[in-house]
């Protein structure tokens, strides 16, 4: 699996992946992403800012992820304690094609994100998710992330994790 920076012409495929992910979350009883977020405007901003990436596997688009090296303002309001106070990378909006779910691709996305972060001398990796998203919580724990506390984001409480890399 490799990451490729998303371009405006990828928007249609990305929105397909986002819609698939929304349906997957709903089927699994997860309230996350059921209020219109992320929408096309959000993804267009990811692309414009160079933080939107396609996950390419066997020459096909297998997923989308936002990898952001800018500070997340909501993380300043953590009710808890981060592992570090150093610069960090954040993953948002991870959406995988239904055909590749359960095959370890999300873990590969995390590995590639870590590689990108280390290439920029960044050694902290943060992620947040809804408390009812058991799938993402399991993925984070499996990949060495530690629970650090809760944040308020988009008028809802999220659980926040960090991994030192």
Language model region names:
Residues 2-16:
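A short beta-loop-alpha structural element at the N-terminal edge
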Residues 22-42:
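Conserved GNAT-fold acetyl-CoA-binding loop/helix
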Residues 51-65:
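Conserved beta-hairpin
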Residues 66-93, 101:
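Conserved acyl-donor/pantetheine-binding loop and adjacent beta-alpha core of acyl/acetyltransferases
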Residues 69, 128, 141-160:
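Conserved catalytic-core motifs of GNAT/GCN5-like acyltransferases
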Residues 96, 102-115, 138-142:
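Conserved acetyl-CoA-binding loop-helix of GNAT-fold acetyltransferases
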Residues 101, 127-136:
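Conserved beta-strand-loop-alpha-helix junction that forms the acyl-donor binding cleft
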Residues 110, 117-129:
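Conserved GNAT acetyl-CoA-binding A-motif
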